[in-house]
């Protein structure tokens, strides 16, 4: 089973994906830099948690696109 992420991670991550989807990828390191620029989280840990969830959401979107084309 995976981790349960709190609302203070999910909400900003969803907003970032909604507004800046064209700048995001499935690469955590790249998303970490985007989150740092866009959201300015207070701590590194929070930045990484948000970037991790953003990466998760982007992978889900990619899978949905692939399944939709088959």
Swiss-Prot record:
One of its GO terms (biological process) is translation. PROSITE patterns: RIBOSOMAL_S17E. The gene is rps17e. Keywords: Ribonucleoprotein, Ribosomal protein. It comes from Methanopyrus kandleri (strain AV19 / DSM 6324 / JCM 9639 / NBRC 100938). The keyword Cytoplasm does not apply. Belongs to the eukaryotic ribosomal protein eS17 family. It comes from the Archaea. InterPro entries: Ribosomal_eS17, Ribosomal_eS17_CS, Ribosomal_eS17_sf. This is Small ribosomal subunit protein eS17. GO terms for molecular function: structural constituent of ribosome. It holds the Pfam family Ribosomal_S17e. NCBIfam families: PRK01151.1. GO terms for cellular component: cytosol; ribonucleoprotein complex; ribosome.
């Amino acid at each position: 089973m995976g981790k349960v992420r709190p609302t203070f991670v999910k909400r900003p991550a969803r907003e970032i994906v909604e507004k800046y989807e064209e700048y995001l990828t499935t690469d955590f390191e790249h998303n970490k830099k985007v989150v740092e620029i866009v959201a300015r989280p207070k701590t590194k840990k929070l930045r990484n948690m948000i970037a991790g969830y953003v990466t998760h959401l982007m992978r889900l979107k990619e899978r949905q696109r692939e399944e939709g084309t088959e």
